[in-house]
């Protein structure tokens, strides 16, 4: 029977730690972008044409803030998936310790 185990216990633990940090960090960034934090304006991808060509420029910037916030939440969800895979690897490593071959 093939095993789903593809990494060792240290790498799996490292994956869990990085996933937890990534979820916390990206969730906070997503919240701050959704709240349209002025400090993060440098990270919003807009050009001068976006401001000049529109009659209501703040709405374009607010839409870009929301889009970046959604991207952060999507990345946090990917980190949740990586954390779940790492947790499965930790459990498989622990089970392999108890198996006698």
Swiss-Prot record:
GO cellular component, one term: membrane
Topological type in the membrane: Multi-pass membrane protein
First-level EC class: hydrolase
Location(s), subcellular: Membrane
One Pfam family in the UniProt entry: V-ATPase_su_f
Chain ranges passing through the membrane: 13-33, 68-88
EC number: 3.1.-.-
GO molecular function: RNA endonuclease activity
Keyword entries, A-Z: Endonuclease, Hydrolase, Membrane, Nuclease, Transmembrane, Transmembrane helix
Predominant place of localization: membrane
Source organism superkingdom: Eukaryota
Stated role: Endoribonuclease which preferentially cleaves ApU and ApG phosphodiester bonds.
Family, as annotated: Belongs to the RNase K family.
The protein's name: Ribonuclease kappa-B
Taxonomic source organism: Danio rerio
